Amino acid sequence: MQEKYLFSEIEPKWQKKWVDRKDYQAEEHSDKPKFYALAMFPYPSGNLHMGHVRNYSIVDVIARFKRMRGYNVLHPIGWDSFGLPAENAAIKNQTPPAEWTWKNIANMKRQLQEMGISYDWEREVTTCHPDYYKFTQWIFLEFYKHGLVYKKKAGVNWCPSCATVLANEQVVDGACERCDTAVTKKDLEQWFFKITDYAQVLLDDLEKLPGWPDKVKTMQKNWIGRSEGAEVEFDLENHGDKIRVYTTRVDTIFGVSYVVLAPEHPLVQKLIAGTEYENDVQAFIERMKGLNEIARTSTETEKEGLFTGAYCINPYSGEKVPIWIANYVLFEYGTGAVMGVPAHDERDFEFAGKYKLPIKTVILPEGTPVEEKDTPLQAAFVEEGMMVNSGEYDGLKNVEAWEKMCDKAEHDGFGERKVNFRLRDWLISRQRYWGAPIPMIYCDHCGIVPVPQDQLPVMLPDDVVFKAGENPLTTSESFKQTICPTCGGKARRETDTMDTFMCSSWYFLRYTDPHNAQLPFAKEAADHWMNVDQYVGGVEHAILHLLYSRFFTKALRDFGYLKVDEPFANLLTQGMVCLGGAKMSKSKGNVVSPEEIISKYGADTARLFILFAAPPERDLEWNDQGVEGCYRFLNRVWRLAAQYEEVLKTTGAGANEFGELDKAAKDMRRQTHQTIQRVTSDVGARFNFNTAVSAIMELVNALYLYKEQPQVNLAVAREALESILILLAPFAPHITEEIWSELGHEDSIHSREWPQVDEEALVQEEVTVVLQINGKVKERIQVPAQISAAELEAQVRQLPRLGEWTQGKQILKIVTVPGKLVNVVVK
């Protein structure tokens, strides 16, 4: 071995060998159990950041560990390569998005290979390649064929800066999640996926995912937002129409003091036409048009409303109720109408107080005298209680009244029980170029016609003009003009492209069969590899990507293309990489470049630090001293191997070659097998990579000390050193591969079997017991491992120094914990 650890020579050498030998290709036909390890694939922004390094290092440890445990591992990588940054770069630099994207992919691929990640590069996918988006279009058509895609005019979230529509999930606090521009409302014809058809099963099947973090499942539950309530009709006064209201609190309906319509509700125009209220209401409606959903419904937003001049009739009490419009009611949610019950809803209480509307109590806390039913409230009462001011339902518990009132609505025909979901259908249309074209055609004779599957892919054209605020595909006549596949007449192509989440909602399926030219994947291949056994990515994808991927998987199962109905069996959401207490980002100027760290210390050091510095699910604080420490540790491993190299090359390590072991050799073997046991558990069961690395470091220290013994059992030393290398291999693959080779092994360390724990080696003949006097440590004593409590107490009483420590005091009792401590209680 060379005297110095030269990572700059070692790492490229092994990276090339691994690729040339195709060491990490998954086996197509194998008797081994399968394991599918996957990190969320990256957007090719141009350079890896430390968040990438952490994500991919975590999955690589898992993949390498599973290979060594006898699994046939699928560990692929690809590029989520459509999206706005490429298009914005095209506008700014006059560079075609494809050119910008492929250049970035080449650079990031080089960086990934320099990290030594054990990818099966034969399965690499790129979503902007026609061979890939052909099948994104194919999947769109399958969903369309099965009635899960439709087009409608809708008030959509519009980002003026990005000049495109945003899904509800892409609006954060009223702003575009990408550029932070305030989002407005705009009416456009858009394509939608009917994810709401799967709302209930998406909710129910979260119970099938014990390997997912509770936080992520809760976020999805809240986003789906299932509620059980009733829809009831309020007749309009002097009018033939009705207002349908959805409520989860039909038990409070006798307390309704107003009904609110969304400003966009079609009834509003009928109610105000020709009245004295028309102008003011129209002005209010116009003002609402410029506001997006979040801005209108946020708890921070002041509730605004206006009386329409019209009234409706409460179907239970027969009372006349004023009709208002307000900013917080959205036409897209429920029925676009809500009933206002100020006494029992905090928002309604606030609204009624502002506009001096009546507040009528209809539920009292249990035990409250009925005489207090009309006492003015200081705040809304939202708990359960007894019904008052509610006609025939007075005296009932409100939960009983809820059922009876629903029964009445259904019996009398003015309402019914109803389950509602917060989840909306997925709007996938984007007015941008760099996305998969929507494979639909508009014909004046035939209407909307899907592109035949044998004509896919619908390719992105090159003859487009990039201008801020304009959809580039509308500038390409060669793209727009086409022939109707049904009648052969002139027709126009759809010029919107798909949301990039369309491509990332099925990429994990393409990895199972990436070179299939006829189908997105063969059922046999997908059924073999799916589910993904371990998925790793940021919690910021909890709703969008993870929900859409679950939806796609369930639908494709229903279409007959898959056996599984959940894509990811286990999910790990890794923490952020921080510097100075804040997430690394260019805008904060606190970025550490992976390339700089790798060039200075090597990829193994970068990997080791990022895995050692914190548990994977926690945020990691970057620390230069910690990086230096990991580099020094790898140098210690190198020097340790160099010191043992010559003698170990000629020494076997068979089970029968240890011979008679002295105490030092037994202790060394015990620590070796304790470390094997601990690392196996930490990596395999808990992903506690930091404690696994710590255990390996302790074993290295122990082997250094063992080397100083007067007599070294070389078989024991070899077992310890080889165990160190194998246990360290998933974390630091290059240095361990090099040392393994230098020790005379011809096979790759990464193809070695993971070491087994020798239970006999774990048996201790002696243990160290702590001796305390009134809880204060006085001494540590060696005793037989199997000593009983009585024997331990007797041995302590015979200690010469016990009299010295207890002089002038009375021994009250001696508490023993065999194998751990003895506490002598005195006064």
From Swiss-Prot:
The keyword Aminoacyl-tRNA synthetase applies. PROSITE patterns: AA_TRNA_LIGASE_I (PS00178). It catalyses: tRNA(Leu) + L-leucine + ATP = L-leucyl-tRNA(Leu) + AMP + diphosphate. One of its GO terms (biological process) is leucyl-tRNA aminoacylation. Its EC number is 6.1.1.4. Keywords: Aminoacyl-tRNA synthetase, ATP-binding, Cytoplasm, Ligase, Nucleotide-binding, Protein biosynthesis. Its main location: cytoplasm. It is found in: Cytoplasm. A motif ('KMSKS' region) lies at residues 583-587. InterPro entries: aa-tRNA-synth_I_CS, aa-tRNA-synth_Ia, Leu-tRNA-ligase, Leu_tRNA-synth_edit, M/V/L/I-tRNA-synth_anticd-bd, Methionyl/Leucyl_tRNA_Synth, Rossmann-like_a/b/a_fold, tRNAsynth_Ia_anticodon-bd. GO terms for molecular function: aminoacyl-tRNA deacylase activity; ATP binding; leucine-tRNA ligase activity. ATP binds at K586. CDD domains: Anticodon_Ia_Leu_BEm (cd07958), LeuRS_core (cd00812). A motif ('HIGH' region) lies at residues 42-52. It comes from the Bacteria. Coiled coil: none annotated. GO terms for cellular component: cytosol. The keyword Iron-sulfur does not apply. HAMAP family: Leu_tRNA_synth_B (MF_00049_B). NCBIfam families: leuS_bact. Belongs to the class-I aminoacyl-tRNA synthetase family. This is Leucine--tRNA ligase.
